[in-house]
Design a protein with these regions (language model features):
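Active-site glycine-centered loops adjacent to acidic/histidine catalytic or metal-binding residues
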Residues: 58, 120, 150
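Canonical P-loop GTPase G-domain recognition
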Residues: 114, 123-181, 185
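Conserved glycine(s) of the Walker
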Residues: 16, 156, 248
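Conserved C-terminal guanine-recognition region of P-loop GTPase G domains, centered on the G4
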Residues: 48, 53, 75-146, 217-220
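Conserved, well-folded catalytic cores of nucleic-acid-processing
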Residues: 27, 46-50, 65, 80, ...
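P-loop NTP-binding site
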Residues: 185-295
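Catalytic P-loop NTPase motifs of RecA-like helicase/translocase cores
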Residues: 39, 63-64, 96-97, 125-126, ...
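Conserved G1/Walker A P-loop phosphate-binding module
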Residues: 1-83, 91
Length: 295
């Protein structure tokens, strides 16, 4: 008998949610960087193990919003905690509960969904420190399970799947068995470009960028022609993104193309353009245009 489980992954920015998503799927479908608010939309990942299909929802980092884009991202998290079979609250191995975790725990109380505490990054600390973290969070909320993991090394992931199996419901799979994400190829390509913006640029500049695919076509020989436009909020930011004699934009494009080649499994010719849209993060029309619509 086939079974399915809908699972939401939530937590503060940079706690490792997207790294975990990629590790569970076994392929890179969610972009990763060391900067907060890397994930902007909910990303659905599909993992099949035996007769069970796990539908994992990677959500934006829960934070105090400063723009309408931030408002949208926080709302995505709030909605994703409801009407699922289980919620994974991912935290760092630190014996302190921050305001983001407090707000998410309160949302768990409201939703009533089964909740599993994931203590990530255990490869970076002495395991004896985990006892204090477990005691602190167990006093704050009655979690159904507590699982220490390392999304980076894979430690604890088999135990996580064993626990998630308990919440699977008998019935047909929700997605085809050969599907690993519901994201369109164009969207993943745009996100891979945005990941390189986050990697190569400093401070606020990458957070004020959006990427739009303006051309996606396949030749008879399988080569893909891809054109993307990078939008930023200021002319000064545009100059930094392009760089001296176009050096920065070339670097971003080359790094992105390598990942896109690997993801698409074929040669990709990538062209990048940079345009300015002032204050797009506070414009509902522009947010909808870039796929961050009202919920």
């Amino acid at each position: 008998m086939t079974k399915s489980a809908m699972i939401t992954i939530c937590g503060r920015p940079n706690v490792g949610k997207s790294t975990l998503t990629n590790a569970l799927v076994g392929e890179k479908i969610a972009i990763v960087s060391n900067k907060p608010q890397t994930t902007r939309n909910r990303i659905t990942a599909i993992v099949n193990r035996g007769d069970t299909q796990f539908v994992l929802m990677d959500t934006p980092g829960f934070h105090k919003p400063r723009t309408r884009l931030g408002d949208y991202m926080v709302q995505v998290v709030r909605e994703s905690v409801a009407d699922v079979d289980a919620v994974l609250l991912m935290v760092e191995p630190v014996a302190a509960i921050g305001p983001q975790e407090e707000a998410l725990i309160e949302r768990l109380r409201e939703s009533g969904a089964p909740a599993i505490l994931l203590i990530n990054k255990i490869d970076t600390v002495d395991k004896t420190r985990l006892l204090d973290v477990i005691a602190l969070y167990s006093a704050a909320y009655d979690f159904d399970a507590v699982i220490p993991i390392s999304a980076k090394t894979g430690e604890g992931l088999d135990e996580l799947f064993t626990e998630l199996e308990k919440y699977a419901v008998e019935g047909p799979h929700l997605f085809p068995d050969d599907m690993i994400t519901d994201q369109p190829e164009r969207q993943i390509c745009a996100e891979l470009v945005r990941e390189k913006l986050l990697t190569c640029l400093d401070k606020e500049i990458p957070h004020g960028t959006a990427v739009e695919v303006t051309k996606f076509s396949e030749r008879d020989d399988g080569i893909i022609d891809l054109e993307v436009t990078i939008y930023c909020e200021k002319d000064s930011h545009k100059g930094i993104i392009i760089g001296k004699k176009g050096a920065m934009l070339k670097k971003i494009g080359e790094l992105a193309r390598m990942d896109i080649d690997e993801f698409m499994g074929t040669k990709v010719y990538l062209q990048t353009w940079v345009k300015v849209k002032e204050n797009w993060r506070d414009s509902m029309a522009q947010l909808r245009n870039f796929g961050y619509g009202e919920r």
